[in-house]
Amino acid sequence: MADDDPAYVRARVPDYADYADEASRHHTDLVLRTFVGEHLNDARQRVGDELDERTSKTLDELILHCQFTDQAFIHWLDHARLDPPLVASLVAIDRRLVELAERVKDANASDLHDLLEAIDIAFEHRREPLPA
């Protein structure tokens, strides 16, 4: 299955839609952030007491990021002309976020920081994806 195949994300993220119109774009953002945020929160509960200060701070910042709409991303998304290559890029980034969130689920405290940095980078890449 290609990285830009939405079936992978749909199989893991309930109600993952597409990027066809403004409403579906906002909904897709919400359900994806919710999915990632739930996995991050589970990690906080599971290994939070074992985290160093830097990792704990990064985790808290990402959980907060997942709770609220990224206004820069939504503004870009609302005004972007989403042709098929751009949608494929968004789906590939969404898949990366799903894969990373699933890895967080089983990560121990010492492995968590690198995963959190990768999630932060993936969220940044959503702001201006490059065509696949």
Residue ranges of predicted features:
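Charged linear interaction tracts used for macromolecular binding and regulation
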Residues: Q45-P129
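Leu/Val/Ala/Ile-rich N-terminal alpha-helices, chiefly Sec-type signal peptides and the beginnings
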Residues: M1-G48
